[in-house]
Amino acid sequence: MTEQPLNEPVLGYSPGSPERNSIIQEIDRQMSETIEIPCIINGEEVYTGHTIPQVIPHNHGHILANVHLAGREEMESACSAAVDAQRSWIEIGLEERCKIFEKCADLLAGDWRMRVNASTMLNQSKTVFQAEIDLSLIHI
């Protein structure tokens, strides 16, 4: 790795705190729209037209997203693309791989922290503290 990793600060989410206000705003934003979630195959978005609704577990009347399901053709294509990607990934050196994961960790600790936490809370009916724990496990 390029440098010694540091732990992220623990956020308290107390009433009126900046992080509490941020998570509330992000939850409101995500609840205000219904998104389309395509299959991602070889880096390309694939909209199959065969969808199921993704609802909030504690509020089945609220649809967060329409998820496009993969059929046989999409599954075969995705498996083939994954095997090809594995071959490319093997050729990347350890230092470069570490940089990729460090960039992901930086995004999750920064700009994407509230977005991922809000999504976890809505899609899995978790508290903000449970979402924070899940997010920290992604860093590993």
Where are these regions (language model features)?
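Glycine-rich loop-to-alpha-helix module at the N-terminal edge of alpha/beta enzyme cores
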Residues: 49, 55, 61-138
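Hydrophobic face of amphipathic alpha-helices that form TPR/SEL1-like repeat modules
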Residues: 1-64
